């Protein structure tokens, strides 16, 4: 068990956690350690606990966070905690200041970079220009605790990807394209 497991290690603490972080009553959660993630099906939302505690993620998920995940074809498991901090910090700025920022505005300031654990992080393109400041340098050891979220957790207007993708170029495999390519090469 990781450091944040103590927040949800009993039924009473789960009820308290759900109440404190504003989970709807028809949403159910349970704790899963990093080693048990392989047994989880991709129909349930799985989030590191730190994304809720420090990253500002709430259920149902903010539309801007879902748009970010869809844009980059990422599941929440593929993002390090700082991604949630930056995206949710930007979403809060938009809500508080009435801004209409897009994912493209965000990628003007940040770039998505792959980490060593096949996860992705956001890195500022210019050290002096950031949307969200005061982020910790590392969340090492704090992303080992996960919540499996079931029930009515989805945003009613837009849904988030749950199956991990690999970023990069995908091969176009339409049969007509392959046929035309073969003719072109001869």
Model-derived features: positions:
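Residue-register detector that marks a fixed positional context within folded domains
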Residues: 1-186
